[in-house]
Amino acid sequence: MILTVTLNPAIDVSYPLDELKCDTVNRVVDVTKTPGGKGLNVCRVLNDFGETVKATGCIGGESGDFIINHLPDSILSRFYKISGDTRTCIAILHEGNQTEILEKGPLLSVEEIDGFTHHFKYLLNDVDVVTLSGSLPAGMPDDYYQKLIGIANLNGKKTVLDCSGNALEAVLKGDSKPTVIKPNLEELSQLLGKEMTKDFEALKEVLQDELFEGIEWIIVSLGADGVFAKHNDTFYNVDIPKIEIVSAVGSGDSTVAGIASGLANDEDDRALLTKANVLGMLNAQEKTTGHVNMANYDKLYQSIKVKEV
């Protein structure tokens, strides 16, 4: 079983408009509301793929109830209730653009943070892999992912971390290392303080930096150009075919789902990398974020090339 952790989930609201007019009324006909957050995208894709998955995180208020009530019944909801209201994130789609209005989310108390920590320990009993995705809510220290990874490691669980900024830096500089991290080139550049390109030799060199010591897998997203990956001392380039993209939103989360599935099923390097990229591409072919159409899986799987470099 796979456990997905979304500490700062949201309700994602989409407002499509022909034109966004400022300082006046804009009327929306077609409103879409879905449970949002990187980890929730991961769990939905895992569910589509047929994996047994349970989802946790911190939720509160009517917005939190909405999230629980609008996840598929086959996903085991094991969320931790907090006093604050789960945030709402609004995307206004207009004239080919997307304007986002993102709430910060609730402020967690020390007691709530401690409560979730104990809740997390309990949830580890019957899982093999844990995914940790997205931003930390207000009140949680930057090293909180480091704490959860340490607990998972003590219990023999594999972890996949997909975050950025201070939270990622705290993990890399801490003692407890995740099994997998999945930065993109922009995030890698921020970590290293220099601009990174798709040059394989340069990527090889930086992924051997002491900053990444102790991390079994480093999987760097190159967008439409696939993936560059390091597993222990072996490097891979994953070449993906060109596809018609409907929406790339959530494709990174779908890739995390594939990584977690590969780890849970003890797949070899090539199978894990291929599955992860296929699920990311399948999500990009869908309008709905965090959804994959498995009818196209086999065809895409055969078109991906994994090369040791």
From Swiss-Prot:
It catalyses: D-tagatofuranose 6-phosphate + ATP = D-tagatofuranose 1,6-bisphosphate + ADP + H(+). GO terms for biological process: D-tagatose 6-phosphate catabolic process; lactose catabolic process via tagatose-6-phosphate. InterPro entries: LacC (IPR005926), PfkB_dom (IPR011611), Ribokinase-like (IPR029056), Tagatose/fructose_Pkinase (IPR017583). Keywords: ATP-binding, Kinase, Lactose metabolism, Nucleotide-binding, Transferase. It comes from the Bacteria. This is Tagatose-6-phosphate kinase. GO terms for cellular component: cytosol. GO terms for molecular function: ATP binding; phosphofructokinase activity; tagatose-6-phosphate kinase activity. Its EC number is 2.7.1.144. The keyword Metal-binding does not apply. CDD domains: FruK_PfkB_like (cd01164). Signal peptide: none annotated. It holds the Pfam family PfkB. PANTHER family: 1-PHOSPHOFRUCTOKINASE (PTHR46566:SF5), 1-PHOSPHOFRUCTOKINASE-RELATED (PTHR46566). The keyword Kinase applies. It comes from Streptococcus pyogenes serotype M18 (strain MGAS8232). Pathway: Carbohydrate metabolism; D-tagatose 6-phosphate degradation; D-glyceraldehyde 3-phosphate and glycerone phosphate from D-tagatose 6-phosphate: step 1/2. Gene3D superfamilies: 3.40.1190.20. Belongs to the carbohydrate kinase PfkB family. LacC subfamily.
